[in-house]
Each structure stands twice: as structure tokens, then as C-alpha cells.
Amino acid sequence: MQILILGFEYLPVKVGGLAEAVTSIAEGLSNLGHEVVVFTPSHGKEMGEPFTSFRVSAFGERVDVTVRKREQNGVIVYSLGGGVLDSPDIYGPGWDGLLRKAVLFGKASVGLMNKLIGEFKPDVLHAHDWHTVFALGLLRKYFGLRSVFTIHRLNKAKVPARYFHEANLDELVPYPDIDPEHTAAYIADAVTTVSRSYLLEEWDFFGLFEGKVTHVFNGIDCSFWNEDLIETRDLPREERRRRILENLGLRDGKVFMFIGRFDRAQKGVDTLLRAIELLSTDPSFSDMRFLIIGKGDPELEAWTRAMENRFPENVRAITKLLSREVVRELYGSVDFVVIPSYFEPFGLVQLEAMCLGAVPIASAVGGLKDTIIDLSSDPEHATGMLVPPRDAFALASAMIWAKELDDETLERLRENGKKRAREDFSWEKACERYVRVYGGRVDKAVSFLR
């Protein structure tokens, strides 16, 4: 099968989990024997060899589009540059800049497909998230491609109709303001999202496409998130933890780590900080250590640093981006990873942690509750703990319970987590299901079936 993938992020260009997902899907499909081609904006990165160039009319200007081609782990990647496509601000500059980039990406994708169509006529077009709506619409319009649209996280924004007019998609603009996710889902032959629970939680949207909507769980690359690859693999886990804490100026203790974006609307950092406040009055607090790692909302960053100043023996704030290799060392050393999200379409942190033996304590939402088996519900097969979202008291109570778990239970949680991540959530399984989606051979989400 010849498969064309559209994405605004593709490794090594990334902002969050989207790049990991799109790259893993493309490489996984290639590993299954399919011919996979990716179109992505350059975002100012000159990767690969010059392939072709052409001019595109957009926003009253003629833009010189340059295309570079590279092979990356069996996948052919075309980076489209020129004009705003070269802006290093992946989702910008600004809202207007992002929309202009998305429109230009759509038009440039048609130009590139014109160059390729003699040798590469995709059996399916797989577009990821709303930024690809113009490319999806135009490639369907001019080449009649069967298409799948995957929503990794609903954005719920509206786009002024003039951008669709600029993209030569007048037929898709019945209103002055357009929901690009609704439009992409409407024109696609199939719609997917990344977990069953998220699909049901957002049924007000996904239910509009009943009959062609389903879920495909994301996966995890356990060849990278692997305890055998960490530098301290020959040391007992307790010694790894002690060294990490010593490097941060902390005494040994049970470690609870948060790592992710400081996103006030989603990630629940404020819930964690309130839980730490509650724990500070509990006798268990003296033996608890909290690593809070991430960047984003300035107020949350300031609050996190204030907590470190207030509890210097217990809390460390790291408000910078860490390499994947450093994060892997942390997962292989800490005891627990805290994921207090308000919502989570799928989430990767819990599976990365499980691969490396860190036990997740997470909100019972979306993909988190689909991937984590809760200790209180199924002690024998449990892989972590689930708590209600936005409930600092429940989170604090779970962390106290976690701290007091005996070694046998902790080891069972770790081994169960490693097994579940590797066997049930591989990218190979995800890609096999995507192939069934492409061929229309997959179960559908239906309102009267649960």
C-alpha cells in the first residue's frame, strides 16, 4: 500500500507528543512493508537534499516553494519550505501566521503531489490534526484521494472563512467562521482519535461523524524507553534514585516526578501543587521528594519555583526542556510519575514511565484510564493508580498510599507495567489497526453501543 502522511511535526522537529506519534506511525507502517511518504513544513530546518521547487500564489504574493527530500528509517520525508513555511515558530508566528502557514502548506502540498503523481499515487492520505485541513481538502479535491483524519487532541478553535477562500476551498465555507476539525472530519472517509475513552468523553464532537469514527490507541517505542539503555542500569533502583537526588541537592526519599507542559487548561500542575501543600502537614512528607519538570504557563512556573523555595528539602523545580536521554534516566530512577491531567486524549508519559519501571499515579481520564490498570480495582494485574481529576485531596491520598506500598507490591506494579506497555501498546499493533482503518475493516463507535 502507498500511504501519504501529513503532519505539522515530524522528528526531529517537535513541540510535544504529536511528533513522536506521527513519526512512529510512519515508521511502523513502513516496517509492515508499506511505502510511506510524509509531507511536513520545513519550519526553517534544512534537512535532506534539494528535490524540487515551484511557485505558489498565496495571500496576494507569489511564494517560491522549495522541497527537500530525505529518507529517515525507511520513510521518505519531504520538507516544504518557502515564505512562512520557513518560520521556526512551528505553530506561528501568531495565530494569523499559523493559519497562513497551514494554507501555504496545503497549496504547496498540491504542487509537490503534481511532481510525484506519475510515480506515487497514494492509496490513502492520512492527515494528523487540524493544521493539515487545507492540505487534506486540496489533495482530496484535486487528486481524489481516500483519506483518514486523526485527531490527537481537539483544539475547538474557529478559523475565519477567508483562509478557506484563500486556500481555494470555497465549497467548504458555509459560515463566516469555520471549525477546521469539523471540516476535516466531514470531508474525510474515516475519522480516528487516540483512545476509546477520549472518543466517548468528546462524543458531542465525534458523534457528529457516527458511522465513520473509531479509535486507534497510540503506542510506545520500548526499544528507546528501555531500562537496558540507561547509564546506571547495573545499579539497584534505590541507588539510581539516591544519585539523582544527590545531584539535585536532596536527601534520599520516595520520588514523585511530574514531567510535561505547564498547560493550565490540561496538565493539572496546579492540582499537583495543591496536593503538595496538603501533604506538607502529613508526617509522611519528610520522606517524600517531588521533581516538577516542564515549561509553559509563566504563573505555573513561578508557583512551582515558589514551592521549591518553601520546601527546599522536598521539592525541585526544573523549568527547562530535557533531552529524551536524560528523561529516560529519570524514568529509570524515580519511584512514581504523577500525571494529574484534566483530560488526556492518550498520553505518552504513563507508557514511557511503565516501560522503565516508574509507577504512574494519574487522573482517571481519556487514554490514562485506558492504559493504566488501577491498583484499587485489580491488585493482581495493576500497573498504577487512578484518581479523580482536579481533586488535590485524592491525589495527595494516593501519593501517601504509594509511599507506604511494600516492596512486593511495588515490584509487581513495575513488572505488570513493563509487560502491558510492551505487549499491549506497541506501535506495531497501532499500525496494524490503522491499516484496517485504511481498508474500512475496523469496528466503529456507535451511540447505542457501549
Located regions from the model:
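Catalytic cores of nucleotide-sugar-dependent glycosyltransferases that transfer UDP/GDP/TDP-activated
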Residues: M1-R450
